[in-house]
Each structure stands twice: as C-alpha cells, then as structure tokens.
C-alpha cells in the first residue's frame, strides 16, 4: 500500500469557480470512512464471489475511495465529490484525506491491496480506546498540522456527535477544525444528498467550529 500522508501532489479536480467567493483562501477536508464490514464490503472481499472490483483489488489493488464508494450509501460519495470540488489545498498538499480505522489519514487515491482492505474491514474499531485507531490518526494529524500554513482551514466531513473524530483531531488542529453547520439534525442519506446538491449548484456550505454536538440524526458516521 502506498502511504500518502507524505502530502505530495494535488488532485487535479480540487479547483472550482467559487474559489474567490468562499470563506478562506485555503481549505482541506477530512472524510469519515465508509463501513467495509457491511454486506457489500464483505462480498467485495470474498474471493468466492466474483466482481470486477474485487478481482482487481486482489490482483493489483484499488483506490481507497473507490472501495468506500462501492460499499457506501450516498453519504460517502457525497463527501468525496464535495471535498474534491471545494478543496483548495496549499501547494504540495492533498486536498482531502480519509480517516481510517488503523492507517491514520490516507489520500482518497491511495492504492490498497487485499490485505490492507481486509485489515480495514475487520481490524481496529474507530474507538478512542483502540490504540490501533487512535495512534496512527494522531501521528498523521500532527504531521499534517505542521505542514499546513497559518489560516488554512480543516473541515471534518463526518460526525461531531461523538468524540471518536472530534477529540483526536481537535488535539492536533485546534480552532482551525471546522464542520458543516447544515449537518446538524440530518442523517447520513440527507447529508449525502445535500453535499451532491452543493456541488451541482456550486454552493459551498457554511462551517462552524467542530465541537461535540450530541445527537445529530439517525446515523452518525
């Protein structure tokens, strides 16, 4: 697996026409992951069940974002599209990273092999009590924090209802860590639809400081 928290190279699709009108000159996104432990994820990882993506994953690897888009509902696809459209990373940095259960922060186009995919699906829990999750995340968040120029915003596209994301990320990014205010009170499907609509309309959401907000909606990922 190619570890991409070296921050080398920008995605070619992080530019958008609204850049001059948005809230900050520079902005990156952190995406909560999709669940590889569900039925679609397990079918993809099962060598006895044939699929184009599963076969490619076993033969040569596949991009992490592709795996999550395959297994996810609308929510992850919305997060990925929104981050790619509205990110304005500083020179030399990625515009978005995916929070993982045991590999810290990975760029969406990181190629993972079948062993890594199975580890992400069945290994560490996204729980602050699990060092396999917490330590790599803090390591990569600290490295990213040191690489970011002053004024660059870090936007969490994920739940702020529990401490599993907010607490470790806040320790590294402090006040620059934000989240979309419109996420409050919405479930995952509603958030995904909202994010895709924002991309279609070239309309960026308003962000608030990331603090734990209690119950947000039916699901919190």
Positions of predicted regions on the chain:
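Peripheral peptide segments
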Residues: 2-221
